[in-house]
Swiss-Prot record:
Biological process according to GO: Gram-negative-bacterium-type cell outer membrane assembly; lipopolysaccharide transport
The protein's name: LPS-assembly lipoprotein LptE
Lipidation feature positions (S-diacylglycerol cysteine): C19
Chief location: membrane
Signal peptide: 1-18
Domain of life: Bacteria
Lipid sites, type N-palmitoyl cysteine: C19
HAMAP family: LPS_assembly_LptE
Membrane association type: Lipid-anchor
Encoding gene, per UniProt annotation: lptE
Length: 193
């Protein structure tokens, strides 16, 4: 019986490892991006803190922006916008529920390669209770903080796709240089007599 349980457990581990299954909230950051520079206009802002936390959770060593190393990829955080749209209304016409939309733009600069733009969009619903103004503000602040965390997770999850795009562009460059000869074939301009 113990042998059967061990066999089933081993089989389950092999199946989940073979299909690419991984734990939630973990991203396989490419090895070329394990050392990175985080560049932000607001280094102590909520998005910068959330991205810094996610990078550290994924084993990325962050270097200072003023570092002398120029061979390190850089994640540059750009514009953040939060919009509120009315999702539902009370009978009297007041807004009952908002849908909040956070859009984050960033770019990844790989030295000697290219600049890759990435973005993240997070949606959350927020109930607007007019009788509880203070509680409403606190709840909205908590939701916005959670949205920053989710946006940071989405940005970090896009790092492997950037690495794949970088590899793909390298392959395209090598295939175009090997397909076309460096010098055109020689053509004789002499006419026969």
């Amino acid at each position: 019986m113990r042998y059967l349980a061990t066999l089933l457990l081993s089989l389950a581990v092999l199946i989940t490892a073979g299909c690419g299954w991984h734990l939630r909230d973990t991203t396989q950051v490419p090895s070329t991006m394990k050392v990175m520079i985080l560049d932000s206009g607001d280094p102590n802002g909520p998005l910068s803190r959330a991205v810094r936390n996610q990078l550290r959770l994924n084993g990325v060593e962050l270097l200072d922006k003023e570092t002398t190393r120029k061979d390190v990829p850089s994640l540059r955080l750009g514009k953040v916008s939060i919009a509120k749209d009315t999702a539902s209304v009370f009978r009297n016409g007041q807004t009952a529920e908002y849908q909040m939309i956070m859009t984050v733009n960033a770019t990844v600069l790989i030295p000697g390669r290219d600049i890759y733009p990435i973005s993240a969009k997070v949606f959350r619903s927020f109930f607007d209770n007019p009788q509880m103004a203070l509680a409403k503000d606190n709840e909205q602040d908590m939701i916005v903080k959670e949205m920053y965390d989710r946006a940071a997770e989405q940005l970090i999850r896009k790092l492997p796709s950037i690495r794949a795009a970088d590899i793909r562009s390298d392959e395209e460059q090598t295939s175009t240089t090997t397909d076309t000869p460096a010098t055109p074939a020689r053509v004789s301009t002499m006419l026969g007599n």
